[in-house]
Curated annotation (Swiss-Prot):
GO terms for molecular function: DNA binding; DNA-directed RNA polymerase activity. InterPro entries: DNA-dir_RNA_pol_omega (IPR003716), Pol_omega/Rpo6/RPB6 (IPR006110), RPB6/omega-like_sf (IPR036161). One of its GO terms (cellular component) is DNA-directed RNA polymerase complex. Gene3D superfamilies: 3.90.940.10. GO terms for biological process: DNA-templated transcription. Promotes RNA polymerase assembly. Latches the N- and C-terminal regions of the beta' subunit thereby facilitating its interaction with the beta and alpha subunits. It catalyses: RNA(n) + a ribonucleoside 5'-triphosphate = RNA(n+1) + diphosphate. Keywords: DNA-directed RNA polymerase, Nucleotidyltransferase, Transcription, Transferase. Belongs to the RNA polymerase subunit omega family. The RNAP catalytic core consists of 2 alpha, 1 beta, 1 beta' and 1 omega subunit. When a sigma factor is associated with the core the holoenzyme is formed, which can initiate transcription. The keyword Transferase applies. This is DNA-directed RNA polymerase subunit omega. It comes from Rhodopirellula baltica (strain DSM 10527 / NCIMB 13988 / SH1). It comes from the Bacteria.
């Protein structure tokens, strides 16, 4: 799994080596503090879990360099969408 770190694709996906290392470090801290993995893998190696989460687009860094998950993003988008209007309410 660590071979993926050598690929430029994963570096470019995150936005550079610094952001990638920041994302990995922050996510490892979360996993060590008991956060659940966002992917199903046949390993308990936390580094492999984090890399698989990145490859599967499950986690990313927001503008404040904090970890966001796809679930967080979906909730933000849903909250920002205007509610559908019922024509009978008009």
């Amino acid at each position: 799994m660590l071979e993926e770190l050598k690929e430029e694709e994963i570096v470019n996906k995150i936005g550079g080596r610094f952001k990638l290392s920041t994302l990995i470090q922050k996510r490892l801290v979360q996993l060590n503090q008991g956060s659940r993995a966002l992917v199903s893998v046949d390993t308990h190696d936390k580094m492999s879990i984090v890399l698989q989460e990145i490859v599967q687009d499950k986690i990313f860094l927001n503008m404040e360099n904090e970890i966001e998950t796809v679930d967080d993003l979906d909730a933000i988008v849903a909250a920002s969408e205007a509610p559908e209007l019922d024509p009978s309410d008009l």
